[in-house]
């Protein structure tokens, strides 16, 4: 059965019945006017007999009406618009085509708004699909299956996920909506509208219940592997991020976030501030969002796709200037101090003005949970310097080598601020004191070591 044709036919018949009854004409009177039987009119109005074009013209003439129609494009479940705010940027079709997978066909590009296009998207069919796939929840995120199960989706169903969440994110102000969608960004964006509490709980705990068909939730477009959830509070939006679990050395990531940001602050870096809190019985690091409806964050790896750290430094210099380069170098020195093993090309990047498309600044330093020897066992703290030799950066480059390659006078001055540094203890949640004291002692040795290395080699 073709429901689209049935619906159109039923709409026409409903209008004829409305007109007939509105004029006080009975089925028999209408039949007499057009020279047919009442039973024929009854069958047409009941949907038991198809309405021919000739019969439609006769009925309309008998009712004193004429037929007018336009050959409009049929609505399609596969037609979409990529928008920034309420501005259409690209009109496209998205279709799952069996073995070919998700296929995009670009129909129109807003050439007047090229400066506002996603910097990390190639404007081709394959480029759009790749961008959409990078936008939805990653397969390695904890509780990904539980999150998607809540909505009746699978992690391979990119189109289905986009249909449910409209591609809304807390990283930027893009969204993907059906063609001719009348809704306004102000009524749907995640910065100004309530979240789905159901999905936040599922994302953080792995437990929950079914949600509605459309959900205003950032969980479907948030990256990272740890359990996490965005929560909207009176004074802003906060990310709650738990730790790993299931092993003797698991669960220390929230502590590392809390302590590492103290080091960054002492050095004078532009950094995200972290606190600790228990939610649903799970310890989390919490931080306030650093994007907003007018400012987006783009991971550097989405823009600079080859060339490593040197290419990133060149990009910062070309797009943002020398001050931005110094900030990047300071972050890398900070990572060398705390032995950040997870500073990859997805957790540092740049901020962008959504209204103009111009880059404005480096993003603040964030995501330092896999640092300060969070995976170390108690016996490793008997000789942290020896244990540190087994740790490596995410770039597979020794931390000392990174430091020597990028440190300058500004970074050395920032290092000196750490002499005599100690952590501020949390009022409720802390690592064991002996572990924390050992890390403090190591930081002092590490700072002196790096200063000596710089003096010897510069």
Short names for language-model regions:
Residues 1-18, 22, 59, 66:
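N-terminal flexible/basic segments that precede or flank functional cores
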Residues 24-42:
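Short alpha-helical DNA-recognition segment
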Residues 73-333, 337-339, 351-458:
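Phosphate/dinucleotide-binding and metal-coordinating scaffold of catalytic cores
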Residues 64-74:
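Short C-terminal boundary/hinge segments that cap the last helix of small helical domains
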Residues 344, 349-351:
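Conserved protein-kinase catalytic-loop segment immediately C-terminal to the catalytic Asp
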Residues 48-60:
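Short, basic-rich loop-to-helix N-cap that marks the start of a DNA-contacting helix
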């Amino acid at each position: 059965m073709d429901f689209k044709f049935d619906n159109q036919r039923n709409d026409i018949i409903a209008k004829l019945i409305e007109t007939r009854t509105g004029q006080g004409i009975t089925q028999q009177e209408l039949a007499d006017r057009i020279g047919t039987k009442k039973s024929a009119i009854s069958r047409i109005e009941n949907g038991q007999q198809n309405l021919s074009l000739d019969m439609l013209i006769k009925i309309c003439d008998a009712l004193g009406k004429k037929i007018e129609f336009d050959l409009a494009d049929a609505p399609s479940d596969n037609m979409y618009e990529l928008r920034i705010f309420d501005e259409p940027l690209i009109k496209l079709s998205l279709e799952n085509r069996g073995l070919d997978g998700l296929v995009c066909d670009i129909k129109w590009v807003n050439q007047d708004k090229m400066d506002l296009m996603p910097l990390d998207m190639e404007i081709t069919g394959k480029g759009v699909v790749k961008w959409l796939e990078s936008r939805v929840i990653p397969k390695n995120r904890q509780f990904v299956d539980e999150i998607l199960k809540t909505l009746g989706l699978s992690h391979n169903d990119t189109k289905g996920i986009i249909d449910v969440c409209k591609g809304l994110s807390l990283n930027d102000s893009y969204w993907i909506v059906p063609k001719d969608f009348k809704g306004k960004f102000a009524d749907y964006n995640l910065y100004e509208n309530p979240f789905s509490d159901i999905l936040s709980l599922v994302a953080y705990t792995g437990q929950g219940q079914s949600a509605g068909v459309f959900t205003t939730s950032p969980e479907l477009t948030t990256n990272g592997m740890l359990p996490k959830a965005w929560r909207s509070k009176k004074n802003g939006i906060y990310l709650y991020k738990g730790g790993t679990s299931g092993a003797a050395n698991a669960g220390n990531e929230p502590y590392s976030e809390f302590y590492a940001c103290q080091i960054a602050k002492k050095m004078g870096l532009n950094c995200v501030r972290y606190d600790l809190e228990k939610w649903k019985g799970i310890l989390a690091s919490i931080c306030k969002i650093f994007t907003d409806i007018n400012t987006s964050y783009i991971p550097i790896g989405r823009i600079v796709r080859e060339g490593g750290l040197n290419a990133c430094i060149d990009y910062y210099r070309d797009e943002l200037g020398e001050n931005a380069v110094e900030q990047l170098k300071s972050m890398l020195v900070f990572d060398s101090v705390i032995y950040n093993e997870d500073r990859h090309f997805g957790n540092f990047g740049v901020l962008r003005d959504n209204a103009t498309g111009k880059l404005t600044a480096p993003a603040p330093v964030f995501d330092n949970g896999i640092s300060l020897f969070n995976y170390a066992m108690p016996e490793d703290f008997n000789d942290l310097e020896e244990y540190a030799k087994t740790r490596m950066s995410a770039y597979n480059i020794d931390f000392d080598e990174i430091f020597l390659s990028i440190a300058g006078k500004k970074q050395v001055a920032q290092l000196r601020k750490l002499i005599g540094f100690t952590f501020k203890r949390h009022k409720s949640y802390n690592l064991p004191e002996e572990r924390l004291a050992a890390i403090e002692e190591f930081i002092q040795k590490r700072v002196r070591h790096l200063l000596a290395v710089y003096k010897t080699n510069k």
